[in-house]
Structures are given as structure tokens and as C-alpha cells.
Amino acid sequence: MSPRAGLNRAVVVDAAAALADEARLEDLSLGDLASRLGVRKPSLYNHVAGIGDLKRELSLVGLRELGRSLSRAAAGKAGDEGLLALAEAYRSFVKDRPGLYEATVRSYRLSDPDDPELGAAEREALEPVLAVLASCGVSGEEEAIHAARGLRSIAHGFATLEEAGGFGIALDPDESFRKLVRAFADGLRSGERRA
């Protein structure tokens, strides 16, 4: 195979993201990626240092994409409306980009925990969540992080159960999700009263 014209790091990462979304991040291999791109595996090393570097880049791309999605969802919204918009955006990201999402969950396990680019991307994804939580009366960074973890856990857990076929009873999962987010919002309000 001759070198493919137009092949660069961004093209390699985009193809890897598509492969990860089709299968699983864990199953992503440089051999499969090379086949997808129509190049020999050694050609990939002109663009990525190896599978670890590629997965780190997928974490970065995924965090940035998730952050943009959360920012769009939260724009102009506050309170319960903002919480639901964020949770739905998160749930949609899990469904639409499963491999890329998996890379965001594993971001710090895949590379250096002090990686400044990954840290900045995580912070950017967190900003719209913190803004909406502040509109719900959550104050102080520590409390906001606890609440953000709670909201993320709700969206992650629901979406992964849903994707695995875990909701077999004939009830609308969208309504279940809305009720769950409303219960979380109610909990935030009751926690505020106790503080």
C-alpha cells in the first residue's frame, strides 16, 4: 500500500473515534485502524505514538465534544430546566458516541493525571454543569463538585443501562429519566434547606 494522501493526525483520530463508536474502545487496535484507513500499520506511527497516544487523543476529543454538547444544552437555561437539558445532552452523547464517551470516562486512566490538555478539557466540560448547579442554589466548589458527580452518575447510569437493554418493562424511558432528574433537583433543594 502506498502512503495515503491527506492522512494526518486529525484524520487518524476521527477514524479511530468512528471505529470505537462501532465496537468498543477496548477493542480498538492499530491494525483495524490501518485497515479502515487503507494504510499499513507502521504508517500510523507518523501520526500517533501508539495505541496509548491514540486513546489519550480520543479522550481529549471526547471531552471537548461532550463539553460543547453540554454548553449548547445549557445555554440560556437555569434551574430544573437546565439540569434536565444537561442530563439529556449527556445521555444523548453516551448513545450517539459510545466509544468516544468511553474514552472520556477513562481519560485519566489512559494517561498522565497531570496532563494539562486533558485537565483543561475536563474543566471546560464541567463549566456548564457548575453554572446550572449555581442557578439551582448549589454554592461552594466542593458542594458543586459533589452535585456534578451526582448528575453525571444519574445520566451515565441511566444511559448505560438503556444502551444495554436494561429497561424491558413497557414504560417510557424518557419519562423515567425526567422523573429521575426531577428527583435529583428536589434533592438539591432539600439539601440546600438543611445546610
Protein language model annotation of sequence segments:
Residues 38-48:
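Short hydrophobic/aromatic patch on the recognition helix
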Residues 20, 54-62, 104, 118-121, ...:
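Alpha-helical DNA-contacting segments of helix-turn-helix folds
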Residues 12-20, 62, 66, 90, ...:
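Short hydrophobic clusters on alpha-helical segments that form packing/core surfaces
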Residues 153-170, 184-194:
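Amphipathic C-terminal alpha-helical segment
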Residues 71-100, 122-124, 144-151:
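Hydrophobic alpha-helical connector segments
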Residues 95-113, 160-168:
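Amphipathic alpha-helical segments used for helix-helix packing
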Residues 1-32, 36, 53-56:
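Basic, helix-initiating cap at the start of DNA-binding domains
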